[in-house]
């Protein structure tokens, strides 16, 4: 076992459970669409984030170091996608019937977004550059970190989804749901600002 697995896990927990784009969207989706219809988002994050870590460990991090402009472009693409999501969330309808006719974020959108999510990319770069070294232990360390990322990702994103679903019980009228959607949209936009500070 990796001697620093505890510190990696603690860092992963902090990065995964604290508010950020993935969690805000999971909360919103759980609130508006329920657990089952949010499963594609849960699976997309659960598989996408560890896959991002794996890609970085296998060499993507070196490309970012050689060509920092690529990482900047990804950050701006992620920002545009988050603005689009915030718009979509802000103007989603309050009624259950309207939500039945709408679709929550899809698996492939969430999976691809992991490569555009500034919070996730920064956390992944920190994990890979700090804890994974090329050499004899590369495969062992990388495998342990990927397993940890899978466990932490599925746990955090599922928790945020359940929190959203639970919060729906307090939604007694359409106005509340509209305000909730506006608040989630604003939180998503605020999370973008923090990437540029």
What are these regions (language model features)?
Residues 2-69, 126-145:
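Juxtamembrane transmembrane-helix termini in multi-pass membrane transport proteins
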Residues 107-115:
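A short amphipathic helical element positioned immediately N-terminal to and/or at the very start
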